[in-house]
C-alpha cells in the first residue's frame, strides 16, 4: 500500500527533527528500516548504523543544533520526498579540519528520502557547510 502525501510529509518532518539535540534515538530506529541505505554516505558506510554514527558526531560537534524544514516536494507514486532544510549550531569540537570555533554555524541541505511501509529505506543528500570554514 502506498503512503499518503500526509504520511510521507509527517515522516520527513520527523526525520529532520532528529537533527536537533537531544536526538530521539528511539524515533531514529523507528524511522529507518533495518536495510536502510545511505546513497550519499560522504566517506562513511552506507548502513543505518553508519548514518546514526554520522548524526551522533554532528550533534556532538554542534551540541545546540536546531533544524528546520524549509520546503518539501512529495511524490506519492514513488514514496519519495525531497526536502530542503536548514540548521544552525555552535561549533564546540573540531569538524572537517576546522575548529572548535565557538561560532554559530549555518548548515543547509537538500535530501531525498524513499519511504516504504512507513520507514525510510534510502537516502540521498547534499549539504552546504561552507560557512563553517
Predicted segment positions?
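C-terminal and inter-domain tail/linker signature
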Residues: 1-133
Amino acid at each position: 500500500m502506498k503512503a499518503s502525501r500526509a504520511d510521507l510529509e509527517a515522516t520527513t518532518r520527523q526525520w529532520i527533527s532528529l537533527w536537533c539535540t537531544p536526538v530521539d534515538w528511539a524515533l531514529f530506529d523507528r524511522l529507518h528500516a533495518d536495510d536502510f541505505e545511505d546513497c550519499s554516505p560522504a566517506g562513511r558506510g552506507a548502513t543505518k548504523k553508519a548514518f546514526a554514527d554520522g548524526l551522533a558526531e554532528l550533534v556532538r560537534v554542534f551540541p545546540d543544533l536546531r533544524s528546520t524544514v524549509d520546503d518539501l516536494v512529495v511524490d506519492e507514486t514513488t514514496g519519495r520526498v525531497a526536502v530542503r532544510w536548514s540548521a544552525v549550531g555552535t561549533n564546540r569540537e573540531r569538524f572537517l579540519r576546522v575548529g572548535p570555533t565557538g561560532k554559530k554555524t549555518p548548515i543547509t541541505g537538500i535530501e531525498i528520502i524513499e519511504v516504504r511501509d512507513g520507514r525510510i529505506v534510502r537516502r540521498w543528500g547534499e549539504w552546504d557547510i561552507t560557512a563553517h570554514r
